[in-house]
Amino acid sequence: MSFENLHKVNAEALEDAVVEICSSLQVDAAKLDELTAYFIECMEKGLNNTSVGEEKTVDKGLPMIPTYVTSLPNGTERGVLLAADLGGTHFRVCSVTLNGDGTFDMQQLKSKIPEEYLNDKDVTSEELFSYLGRRTRAFVRKHHPELLKSTGENIKPLKMGFTFSYPVDQTSLSSGTLIRWTKSFKIEDTVGKDVVRLYQEQLDIQGLSMINVVALTNDTVGTFLSHCYTSGSRPSSAGEISEPVIGCIFGTGTNGCYMEDIENIKKLPDELRTRLLHEGKTQMCINIEWGSFDNELKHLSATKYDIDIDQKFSPNPGYHLFEKRISGMYLGELLRNILVDLHARGLILGQYRNYDQLPHRLKTPFQLCSEVLSRIEIDDSTNLRETELSFLQSLRLPTTFEERKAIQNLVRSITRRSAYLAAVPIAAILIKTNALNKRYHGEVEIGFDGYVIEYYPGFRSMLRHALALSPIGTEGERKIHLRLAKDGSGVGAALCALVA
């Protein structure tokens, strides 16, 4: 029996099943309106809420964490500063030279975080931050050896900004306690501890006491500040100066930030709010932590695959449900779960009689990465040959042409939902801040980073289409400039340190 005959299934039944699944992933204009309105409501509640954490309380709203960043750079800043960046998979240490003309020079050491720190629950916070301290010393030894040779009064201290891309309760520009891990980390004893203090202690142990961690930020705020610095006073297409309004990340995770009027941030202590306003500081950058939007699922749709991924495979069940529908970490996992289900229903991969016979990689959570989906998304080759090769290489999984057509339809629906949901917080912020109507033309800039929005084929186009369908409409979408903020977390952390 030939391979194709062995795999032959009821094509009509498979097609019907895929149509049903794709339909469950659709986000139409009405749903965009509904979600955007609720997002604004959750922003308002979050700005007024003084409790800490991300408990699933309907009235709590979004975290809306004050960052204590009260001004934005304009490209004229100068100086040499250090930055450290702990992301979802890598740790970077950077030396950033701000040239004062919207440009910068950077030296960096990037290290892949060892698997044991990501997946082992027995790892302690001391072990993790000791690793960060050792990698920082390796960077200094390579790029700033003069710091290690200096002694006593000859030591010239260097400011460092620390980009920590996880939810923290930030009480000042230079301190913040971890609320909870997201993405891959599971080190429970870090929760509730000041991450700046943990890092500074390990730097001191490594003989790097000349480095002062003076600013705590996250990748999203860093991206926003970096974008503001490099864009300077860029004229818009209408001849006006376009205004930076939002910083956002669409990569392993997703999040956003924006400048909010201090008088609206009721969660700040009254005396602090009064003092800032007296000092002439009228706005503060708010870290939204929008990955946790609608954890109660009051308005977000949930397929059975979303529920399974959250409850069975994610490191933080019940939290960051919005992120689990958008971010690159979960796109491939959603497809993997759908394929396993279609096999269980006897609609695909008929050569494997039961679940146990399926290739190990197809049964392994998070084995199917978004890079594979990106190749499938744009595959227009004869017989979908690129899709066939991608599955053979990534999962050791042979497929028929009918199966590949079904897989491509699923991939396109998964990523379209991701891009459409990504438009919700952007539209909500623009409406809440009235940014599109502040001036005659009202053109705005959105600084972004993350491999999904930067590299995934068609993601930005789908995002723009969703924005046009959202409450801001076609006219609002046309006023938006999407700008890539490369190396945002490193440069942004340095900019935070500069003003500390």
Swiss-Prot record:
ATP binds at residues 110, 487-492. The modification Phosphoserine is found at residues 2, 470. Residues 218-487 are annotated as: Hexokinase large subdomain. InterPro entries: ATPase_NBD, Hexokinase, Hexokinase_BS, Hexokinase_C, Hexokinase_N. It is an enzyme of class 2 (transferase). One of its GO terms (molecular function) is hexokinase activity. Keywords: Acetylation, ATP-binding, Cytoplasm, Glycolysis, Kinase, Nucleotide-binding, Phosphoprotein, Sporulation, Transferase. GO terms for biological process: ascospore formation; glucose 6-phosphate metabolic process; glucose metabolic process; glycolytic process; hexose metabolic process; intracellular glucose homeostasis. Pathway: Carbohydrate degradation; glycolysis; D-glyceraldehyde 3-phosphate and glycerone phosphate from D-glucose: step 1/4. Residues 12-498 form the Hexokinase domain. Residues 159-185 are annotated as: Glucose-binding. Its EC number is 2.7.1.2. It comes from the Eukaryota. It is found in: Cytoplasm. Induction: Repressed by glucose through the MIG1 and MIG2 repressors. The modification N-acetylserine is found at residue 2. It catalyses: D-glucose + ATP = D-glucose 6-phosphate + ADP + H(+). Belongs to the hexokinase family. Putative glucokinase involved in phosphorylation of aldohexoses and glucose uptake. Involved in sporulation. Required for the full activation of the early meiotic inducer IME1. Present with 10600 molecules/cell in log phase SD medium. This is Putative glucokinase-2.
